[in-house]
Design a protein with these regions (language model features):
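Outer-membrane beta-barrel signature, preferentially recognizing the C-terminal barrel domain
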Residues: 112-161, 168, 185
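An acidic- and aromatic-residue-enriched active-site/binding cleft used to recognize and process polar
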Residues: 70-72, 109-113
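Proline-centered turn/helix-capping motifs that create local helix->coil transitions or kinks
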Residues: 27-29, 114, 170
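Outer-membrane beta-barrel translocator domains and adjoining extracellular loop/strand segments
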Residues: 1, 31-40, 77-88, 117-125, ...
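Transmembrane beta-barrel architecture of outer-membrane proteins
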Residues: 2-7, 47-53, 87-91, 134, ...
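Face-selective signature of the C-terminal outer-membrane beta-barrel domain
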Residues: 1-81, 97, 158-166
Length: 185
């Protein structure tokens, strides 16, 4: 397994806020000789994720804000399939100081998340007798839309944070197990 991660970022301050610009890239290449319950095989895969973004952060009296927009590219390539997914990645954070020790914060974001290497691998794993998990090389990246509203209160004795949230998923990624009585350890 070999991997590389890189990021270039620039921040420019204005009178009332800051502008951030950047580009992040990560690439992982994996070459495996698999020996598992189904036999032996060779498996090569490459995971590439790129993220281009800009964000503006500022404060006006008791009101704070952060507005960001980005573009995420997930490119996964294996012997079975090649997937190329482009997704916008907007982000909005609004905050308001209610009093010296109280605040409200709203955040909203949309992002794309690649399946992990074990989720995409055709490898099969015996968890307990007759119960196995296996990857799926045809999985698509998950898209997550999340909204949060947070109330915070603090004093010398305790901190109270209350969070209300809603999350929506497309192509939800989860681990699954199945019963197989045809496999021997």
């Amino acid at each position: 397994q070999t991997g590389i991660v890189g990021e270039i970022a620039h921040v420019h301050s204005f009178g009332k806020g800051k502008l951030s610009l950047g580009y992040r890239i990560s690439n992982t290449a994996i070459s495996n000789d698999l020996v598992n319950l189904l036999g032996a095989s060779h498996y090569d895969v490459n995971y590439l994720e790129q993220y281009l973004y800009t964000e503006y952060t500022g404060k006006w009296n008791k009101f704070g804000y952060r507005v960001g927009v980005g573009l995420t590219n997930i490119h996964n390539k294996s012997a079975e399939t090649t997937q190329n997914d482009w997704a916008p990645t907007p982000k909005l954070v609004l905050s308001y100081d209610l009093a010296k020790n109280q605040s409200l914060r709203f955040s909203s974001s949309y992002k794309s998340q690649s399946p992990s290497s074990d989720m995409l691998s055709p490898n099969i794993t015996l968890s307990v007798p007759n119960i196995v998990s296996t990857g799926n090389p045809y999985l698509k990246p998950m898209h997550l839309f999340r909204n949060n509203l947070k109330y915070s209160f603090s004093n010398d004795y305790f901190d109270l944070n209350t969070l209300v949230f809603a999350s929506f998923f497309q192509n939800y990624l989860m681990q699954s197990y199945s019963f197989r009585n045809d496999l021997q350890k």
